[in-house]
Amino acid sequence: MKKTLAALIVGAFAASAANAAVVYNNEGTNVELGGRLSVIAEQSNSTRKDQKQQHGELRNAGSRFHIKATHNFGDGFYAQGYLETRLVSDYQSSSDNFGNIITKYAYVTLGNKGFGEVKLGRAKTISDGITSAEDKEYGVLENKEYIPKDGNSVGYTFKGIDGLVLGANYLLAQKREAYKTATATPGEVIAQVISNGVQVGAKYDANNIIAGIAYGRTNYREDLATQDKSGKKQQVNGALSTLGYRFSDLGLLVSLDSGYAKTKNYKDKHEKRYFVSPGFQYELMEDTNVYGNFKYERNSVDQGKKAREHAVLFGVDHKLHKQVLTYIEGAYARTRTNDKGKTEKTEKEKSVGVGLRVYF
């Protein structure tokens, strides 16, 4: 029997839970282990920062594992601890990108099925799941430039109404100085890193309709030691939104994502950026899906430099087994930058890859 697109999307969001193994379940306590190994063979000119030439590589593409412990108190109350890692290299010279085990998320949760939950620690924020565009590796949406999608935070999430998620987050300082230098004091927030921030958002996903919006205000520590414009970011006010509709009988989802942000700089001109991105996801046949999206993004400085980016992504994925996924994905982006008195600069990014994910 052919699966509906709604079922596929719900399954994708619950992939980690569906593939996790229950290693302990007794007297209201449940412990799960899960994760995936992911490898991609690619041709790309944007694997590393400032890369110019296109190269072929076989590398890690988000391999991870997680452990989740849930303790049920009764009457719908529960506590949960969650730890998720990544297997990545700290060195740009490591071509396969496998390396140390690092912590991606680590948090504790106290909640009630009817009243919502409070989450404390390094976790995703409400803005993480707002946009609808699908990708496996080369996502062209840079949502974190508008609103941070994770970090050290205190968050509240309410899911008491079917299909509706409401959330709010307060972000704390992400990095602090460890040593005393001529320009740094131990314990102070590192320059140009998040000092604090707030986010609120809502997403509705039911009755074939998807709608979501999030707003965030993020403050950054000024870099007093840097005299040029690179150290002047003060505050970013950003918003993200999505609107989509599922044609269940056709196995088709169409969506429109968008974002807007204004960056305030210390004693310097402000910056504005926005994007719009129509996209689709289509169930070609059982266990095979086609997806893609287009993005137009503009970034400008008051009476100054302007950059326009056009980007497109297209992919096909196929489930070989309930715990094995393979995909082909490609992305192309072109950015044109104009600055007063200077020749227009054009940059292009091209990537195509074949990936394999094995869940456990």
From Swiss-Prot:
Signal peptide from the UniProt entry: 1-20
A GO molecular function held by the record: porin activity
Subunit structure and binding partners: Homotrimer.
Membrane topology, record value: Multi-pass membrane protein
GO cellular component, one term: cell outer membrane
Gene3D superfamilies in the cross-refs: Porin
Keywords: Cell outer membrane, Ion transport, Membrane, Porin, Signal, Transmembrane, Transmembrane beta strand, Transport
Recorded family membership: Belongs to the Gram-negative porin family.
Protein purpose: Forms pores that allow passive diffusion of small molecules across the outer membrane.
Lineage: Bacteria, Pseudomonadati, Pseudomonadota, Gammaproteobacteria, Pasteurellales
Listed name of the protein: Outer membrane protein P2
CDD domains referenced in this protein's UniProt entry, alphabetically: gram_neg_porins (cd00342)
Gene Ontology terms describing biological process: monoatomic ion transport
Coiled coil regions, renumbered to chain: none
Domain of life: Bacteria
Subcellular location: Cell outer membrane
